[in-house]
Amino acid sequence: MEVEVKAKQAKAAARRMAVLDENTKNLALNHMADALIKDIGKILEANKKDVVEAEKRNIKASLIDRLKLDEKRVEAMAKGLREISALPDPVGSIEKMWKRPNGLQIGKMRVPIGVIGIIYESRPNVTADAAGLCLKSGNAVILRGGSDAINSNIAISSILAKAAYETGIPEGAIQLIENTDREEVNRMMKLNGLIDLIIPRGGASLIKNVIENSTVPVIETGVGNCHIFVDETAKFNMAKDIIVNAKVQRPGVCNAVETVLVHKSIAKEFLPLMVEELTSLGVEIRGCQITKEICPQVKEATDKDWETEYLDLILAVKVVDGIEEALDHISKYSTGHSESIITENYENAMMFLKSVDSAAVYVNASTRFTDGGEFGFGAEIGISTQKMHARGPMGLEELTTYKYVILGSGQIRK
């Protein structure tokens, strides 16, 4: 079985990864970045095969956008690796140290998790991000991308692994499962003792499948039914610009807005401005009854729209009585990813920040900033929507755990 063989190789590599010095890891990351640029033609050629195949299968445009690479995106992948190399290495750092009355010194040391399995869909840039972050945090990684991006992933992972091994990274530390049979994923999720953690990145069905079937511990990531609430004191131009950015810039990503809630006192003035701007940009609006009365051209929303992560140029719009109804709606339908309030009212802003139970909560800013790079973490492994171990964009520190180190001078317990 391919996955079991590679998991054993990764497990062996993980022991050596844990003790690598920072200079070796940084050298490898920069060499990997150089290799991506050097072999950019090979990557784009492989990616073209994936895109052509996706177009033949009539995959929607927003998903093809996630799959497609160009020189700029490959350069961004290389830049991400260099940025990771410049970040402080968390491995081996002592978070705190205290001394007991018997003279024992006890501390918490950051250590790698071990072998991390990444299961993801049609975004080949994840291959580079995951390999880079796992390497810098001292972990071995097993990558299992979607079949849509198999040619791209093989090209990228082989280039990265070769470059890493040339600079002293143990062989087996970067593995890609090339078999696209879903049964390989099922096997991967049962490899307790070989794989220490699985992180799924993709749509709701993928994440649900991993959570329900994995016996290996899982960090749940990023289904993003994200909301923006336009409060009655909002500046219209600011609100419109934020909503356009959050919906239109990249509609197929998890931090794009899916539902806009508008305070009833400004709905008659604000909604026509917002709807006109969005429809001119190709966005389909699905509105509540009040929204439809104000803007008859919009489609009528159903209850299903409030719970849908469209990942497309579609936006649900609802008029609410005020912040309390907005908070109730978000509490009911949010996936815990990212929510924003547009307001000039300090009390409402603070209420929103305290009340919304999501990984990232904004005041007067686009939800599109929920991203490891934008948060200053470098590339991210994913955006956790759970509360245990990691929450929000997961950078280097979130890919480590800790152990207690105890320094003595002959103490015995009495």
Curated annotation (Swiss-Prot):
A GO BP annotation: L-proline biosynthetic process
The protein, known as: Gamma-glutamyl phosphate reductase
The keyword Membrane belongs to this UniProt entry's keyword annotation: no
Pathway: Amino-acid biosynthesis; L-proline biosynthesis; L-glutamate 5-semialdehyde from L-glutamate: step 2/2
Record EC number: 1.2.1.41
Superkingdom of this protein's organism: Bacteria
Keyword Acetylation: no
